[in-house]
């Protein structure tokens, strides 16, 4: 990334998450350009790093070195902004991931279903949600893809829930909105696997609200 930036023309670099910040920071410093740091999550508190203490220690040192040098920073939730302020005394502006508003169409719920939309990753409460379907008289649609999809598919088969849990795969935004609009309720559950998940404010939270579902 750093080499590409050095040989590119730009006025501002928008660095998304800590793994892009070192290259962006030093490229901006070398070329005298402006930097905006965009923290989509509390990077050093994600489960993938918490489970790898050596790797996490390296990122923590980079974070401690670079964040106090950032003068323009944004993040997705007030909780994450407050955590960074308390730890590094760096101010973050909050820009939430809210969808563009639109006029709700009348709902035609021919099939009653719950909907989970988003990444199929560890810590999203998907295993518990699937197990709960054994006792619920309703379908579960899962829209998205991710690291644990095959594991979830096997879990559904083990519980013999193939007729109640339907994997939709990745959908384009328009098609996904149709499913969200038709849902009885949206699933937005996260396991407390670290401060990043604890303070998260997922996109799906606002998508569900915008589509008028609980």
Model-derived features: where do they sit?
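Membrane-proximal helix-turn-helix segments that form the acceptor-binding/catalytic region
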Residues: 2-9, 22, 26-30, 37, ...
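Conserved donor-binding/catalytic core segment of Leloir-type glycosyltransferases
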Residues: 74, 106-133, 137-141
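Short acidic alpha-helix that forms the nucleotide-activated donor recognition element
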Residues: 65-68, 134, 150-151, 172-184, ...
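Short His-centered aromatic/hydrophobic patch
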Residues: 15-20, 39-40
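A short, histidine- and acid-enriched strand-loop-helix "catalytic/donor-clamping" loop
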Residues: 10, 36-53, 72, 102, ...
């Amino acid at each position: 990334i750093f080499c590409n930036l050095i040989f590119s023309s730009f006025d501002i670099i928008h660095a998304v998450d800590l793994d892009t910040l070192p290259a962006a920071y030093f490229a901006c410093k070398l070329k005298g350009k402006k930097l905006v740091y965009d923290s989509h999550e509390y990077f050093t508190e994600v489960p993938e790093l918490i489970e790898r203490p050596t790797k996490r220690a390296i990122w923590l040192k980079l974070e401690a070195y670079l964040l106090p040098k950032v003068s323009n920073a944004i993040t997705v939730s007030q909780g994450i902004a407050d955590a960074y302020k308390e730890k590094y005394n760096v101010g973050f502006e909050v820009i939430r991931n809210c969808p563009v508003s639109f006029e709700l169409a009348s709902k035609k719920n021919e099939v009653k279903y719950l909907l989970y939309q988003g990444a199929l990753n560890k810590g999203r409460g998907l295993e518990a949600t699937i197990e709960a379907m054994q006792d619920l008289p309703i379908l579960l649609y899962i829209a998205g893809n991710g690291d644990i999809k095959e594991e979830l598919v096997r879990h559904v088969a083990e519980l013999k829930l193939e007729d109640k849990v339907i994997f939709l795969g990745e959908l384009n935004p328009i098609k996904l909105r149709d499913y969200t609009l038709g849902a009885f309720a949206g699933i937005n559950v996260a396991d407390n696997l670290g401060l990043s998940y604890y303070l998260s404010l997922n996109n799906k939270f606002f998508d569900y609200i915008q589509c008028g579902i609980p």
